[in-house]
Amino acid sequence: MRSLGPCAVLVVAFWSYWASAQENAAQEAAHRRAALAHLPADAAQRVFGREATPAAGPPEAIGAYERGCLEGAVALPADGPNWQVMRPSRNRAWGHPVLIALLERLAHTLPAAADWPGLLVGDIAQPRGGPMLTGHGSHQIGLDADIWLTPMPSRRLSAAERDEMPATDLVTADGKDVDEATWTPQHRRLLEAVAREPAVERIFVNPAIKRALCRTAGPDRSWLTKIRPWWGHNYHFHIRLFCPIGQPDCRPQTPPPAGDGCGRELDWWFTPEARLPPPGPAKPLLLGDLPHACASLVAAP
């Protein structure tokens, strides 16, 4: 493994995509303290990270998935039929109402559609969206959600258990394929069912998981277009929704390339070049780097 300089280490600490699902409360708190020790006072991560309540007003996804904020957020309840919110101490179960409604509906339909017992829901967004101190570069406008690839237990977990319970790693140690000891046909059915949702723009998974899906997708492979390989994501998958209708300040992402994404595009992820750390911002985001409306939103009571 190549040596990383101090700046690169700091970037990885801020944007450690692969660490967010499995970190327990103590580990996440340590990364939070490290981030706060280096961030300038006007860093957007610091400003949005201290907000504990949503901004009143109509729901509005403002800006881009990786550079924006969220007005009128609602929280996914900690418990519901066929779902449980994980890592509750992070206070990241907030989202645009369109996303929260989708998660609740998926929790209702997936037991029958995918033989999946229920959703363990990871990070969604902060109460007012915006950049996070740890774990994510996106999740800023309430349209991203992490779903653990661990089946929901048959009992209700305590808050302490939800902050400490480890997530299941589905990828082999060398990163080349799924681990047959943990990967199941239900995982494929789960991801296919979610990808077929019209509101879902794309789903991020580990490249090894994409490779397994390419092998087993069946004759109708259209849903694979939405399954996008990305660093980490061996413990959870990341749902991203399209900008909702009537949200003019929401900036859509460039659509993924046509096709199932199972050829040379996927092969790159298993090259030495792809083993380098994921790209991160050259410097912390400042409040002025976000859409102008975000400064007013974060200043509101």
Residue ranges and their predicted role:
Residues N24-R67:
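N-terminal low-complexity, Pro/Thr/Ser-rich intrinsically disordered segments
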Residues G49, T53-V121, W183-L190, E197-V200:
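Active-site acidic/histidine clusters and adjacent loop/turn architecture
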